[in-house]
């Protein structure tokens, strides 16, 4: 939906004459919904998705019978990523990535992906035992979500940098299209991961009680963990 609106407003901007009020209006609307920009509606939405992921992981840490520390760690990852979406912290990794890229002889536009990959590998290694211990449906949803997210955040992001470099740092429709794909993959991957975590919960209403929340731990039948 957000990507469709951004594309619609971009087309309107292209079809109008620069300097006209309607062109300026389309530009402002495009930037407001541009999934590649920061501190706008899509970035807020992505930040809220990470917050939802963190909240579900923290809830699991409270209700789970085992691996509570790992669930809490997953929640902290979600909090950090939510802050990053709002504050663009990952782009500051260029200070580390640029000298590394020069030393390795790699021609990258977004050099932050080098330390970003290292961080992603470390986080994945720490959380993999937890993910592998989940029930099959949740396990595959989280694994698929992580793979789709990294495909967008690392691979397609690097591709968008190559597009920028090819067009001498000019924002063209090629770059906008690649960025749309990147952000869509990131949001889709995150949504899959959230669905995987939430699939571990069972919320039911009993006649004698309002609501009962059960956390489907990886071993044994679901236990009543909270109400």
Predicted regions: what is each one?
Residues 1-227:
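Hydrophobic alpha-helical segments at protein termini of multi-pass membrane proteins
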């Amino acid at each position: 939906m957000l990507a469709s609106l951004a594309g619609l407003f971009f087309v309107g901007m292209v079809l109008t004459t620069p300097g006209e009020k309607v062109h300026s209006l389309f530009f402002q609307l495009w930037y407001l919904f541009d999934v590649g920009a920061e501190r706008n509606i899509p970035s807020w939405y992505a930040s809220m998705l990470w917050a939802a992921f963190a909240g579900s992981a923290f809830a699991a840490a409270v209700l789970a019978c085992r691996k509570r520390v790992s669930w809490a760690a997953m929640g902290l990852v979600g909090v950090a990523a939510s802050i990053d979406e709002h504050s663009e912290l990952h782009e500051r990794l260029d200070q580390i990535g640029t000298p590394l890229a020069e030393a390795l002889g790699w021609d990258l536009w977004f050099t932050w992906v080098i330390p970003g990959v290292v961080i992603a590998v470390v986080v994945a290694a720490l959380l993999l035992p937890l993910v592998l211990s989940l029930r099959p449906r949740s396990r595959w949803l989280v694994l698929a979500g992580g793979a789709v997210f990294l495909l967008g955040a690392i691979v397609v992001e690097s591709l968008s940098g190559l597009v920028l470099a090819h067009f001498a740092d000019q924002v063209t429709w090629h770059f906008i299209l690649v960025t749309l794909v990147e952000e869509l993959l990131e949001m889709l991957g995150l949504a899959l991961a959230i669905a995987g975590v939430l699939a571990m919960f069972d919320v039911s209403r009993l006649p004698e009680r309002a609501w009962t929340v059960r956390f489907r731990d990886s071993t044994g039948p679901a236990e009543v963990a909270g109400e």
